């Protein structure tokens, strides 16, 4: 078994990538140009026409933000990292950086006949993101070597179950997108509840000597 490496640099790099991703999402919203001499009502109408862009912005920002929190939870469970975790984490970050593209598609085509394709691409990307998180979590928990002693098997299984539920729902959302695009977006948004629970869930640490349960400690608290 190779020596474990400290994860602080990887966490800092990951935080930066998440930050860049959410910044790129807002860049797709353009200030409307109405020309000189037009009254304020024209500008209001132009702003209201941007509602798909703002909707897509909120959806993607909240989703990426909650995923960043879950990423933080995962790494707080680890004593260190190895090459497998580094590669899996790189895949997660690559896919997170791609989120602005389907967000722009939804913003552009949500009210058009091409809405089904745009929403399907949006949901499909999150299938890949979810699958990458599963790979990262399995890489981190395999054999338990990289987990801190206080991380219980129950907590590991809970996170694993949540990830697979999320994957299944994203697959359903992608299929639904071809029939009811708006419903597909709602299904993706409903997953905020699942991911939010995962981000804030507390685990019960084990005593290495007697395996008795102690007080609840949130992994995001350190």
Predicted segments with their positions:
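Multi-pass alpha-helical transmembrane bundle typical of ion/small-solute transporters
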Residues: 1-222
